[in-house]
């Protein structure tokens, strides 16, 4: 015997009425819930967005900037880290001090750093930026460490560092950004100087090039044999100087 058609009809009407009253069905908890839901915090989301879009400012004062320029090329391609070079400090949140910082350039560097919006970061690139480098012993205009002017987050030693070293510094900076909190935004943490000037212990020696070779007789006048071979007459001025030397 066939089932009662009236009961089936009633069930269909009840199902349709439930869909009309509740068009959205109740969510069913499945075993794949842990794979479909991401639990995070505002700090993690905020830090992830910042570390994935660090915008460095195009700034260089010496030969280290050549290595930084190579990093922009297709071989190393730092765009894959989300880095977009900017020419304005108001659009940058990272400055890489590539090269020697002199006393004359120091006020301009501090002004560029102050014009950058918070939060901002600094990477000191090269020995000349960190300690003054080869100019730290006898130069009167080189700054012995850029951290005397602005706080530094990551140091890259080398003369000059390779592009791979810059990538490693950026990765370390990304790890530092990932551990920050949104509550610290806008607070300027005063960093102590990690490098300081000391008197060097190098012994002064006599210079090799004294300039006396410019006063040698062979540079003042060509050899006599050369003049006789070429048939050139000896200038009278040179003859008088030779006579004075003999006297």
Curated annotation (Swiss-Prot):
GO molecular function, one term: NADH dehydrogenase (ubiquinone) activity
GO CC annotations, alphabetized: plasma membrane-derived thylakoid membrane; respiratory chain complex I
Gene Ontology terms: biological process: aerobic respiration; electron transport coupled proton transport; photosynthesis, light reaction
Entry keywords, A to Z: 4Fe-4S, Iron, Iron-sulfur, Membrane, Metal-binding, NAD, NADP, Plastoquinone, Quinone, Thylakoid, Translocase, Transport
The EC number(s) this enzyme carries: 7.1.1.-
Cofactor(s) the record lists: [4Fe-4S] cluster
Co-factor note (free text): Binds 1 [4Fe-4S] cluster.
Recorded catalytic activity of this chain's protein: a plastoquinone + NADH + (n+1) H(+)(in) = a plastoquinol + NAD(+) + n H(+)(out); a plastoquinone + NADPH + (n+1) H(+)(in) = a plastoquinol + NADP(+) + n H(+)(out)
Cellular compartments annotated: Cellular thylakoid membrane
PANTHER family for the chain: NADH DEHYDROGENASE, NADH DEHYDROGENASE [UBIQUINONE] IRON-SULFUR PROTEIN 7, MITOCHONDRIAL
Role description: NDH-1 shuttles electrons from an unknown electron donor, via FMN and iron-sulfur (Fe-S) centers, to quinones in the respiratory and/or the photosynthetic chain. The immediate electron acceptor for the enzyme in this species is believed to be plastoquinone. Couples the redox reaction to proton translocation, and thus conserves the redox energy in a proton gradient. Cyanobacterial NDH-1 also plays a role in inorganic carbon-concentration.
Subunit text: NDH-1 can be composed of about 15 different subunits; different subcomplexes with different compositions have been identified which probably have different functions.
Family of this protein: Belongs to the complex I 20 kDa subunit family.
Name of the protein in question: NAD(P)H-quinone oxidoreductase subunit K
Organism in which the protein naturally occurs: Microcystis aeruginosa (strain NIES-843 / IAM M-2473)
């Amino acid at each position: 015997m066939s089932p009662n058609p009236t009961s089936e009809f009633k069930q269909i009407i009840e199902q349709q009425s439930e869909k009309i009253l509740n068009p959205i069905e109740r969510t069913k908890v499945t075993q794949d819930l842990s794979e479909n839901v991401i639990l995070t915090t505002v700090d993690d989301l905020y830090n992830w967005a910042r570390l994935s879009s660090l915008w460095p400012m195009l700034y260089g004062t010496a030969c280290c900037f050549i290595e930084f320029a190579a990093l922009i090329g297709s071989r190393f391609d730092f765009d894959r880290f989300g880095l977009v070079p900017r020419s304005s400090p108001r659009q940058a949140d990272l400055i890489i001090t590539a090269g020697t910082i002199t006393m004359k350039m120091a006020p301009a560097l501090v002004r560029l750093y102050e014009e950058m919006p918070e939060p901002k970061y600094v990477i000191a690139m090269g020995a000349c930026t960190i300690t003054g480098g080869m100019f730290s012993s006898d130069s009167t205009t080189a700054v012995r460490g850029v951290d005397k002017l602005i706080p530094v987050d990551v140091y890259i030693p080398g003369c000059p560092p390779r592009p791979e070293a810059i990538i490693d510094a950026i990765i370390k900076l990304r790890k530092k950004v990932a551990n920050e909190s949104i509550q610290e935004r806008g607070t300027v943490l005063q960093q102590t100087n990690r490098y300081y000037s000391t008197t060097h212990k190098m012994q002064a020696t006599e210079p090799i090039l004294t300039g006396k070779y410019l006063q040698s007789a062979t540079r003042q006048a060509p050899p006599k044999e050369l003049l006789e071979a070429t048939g050139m007459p000896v200038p009278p001025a040179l003859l008088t100087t030779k006579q004075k030397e003999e006297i």
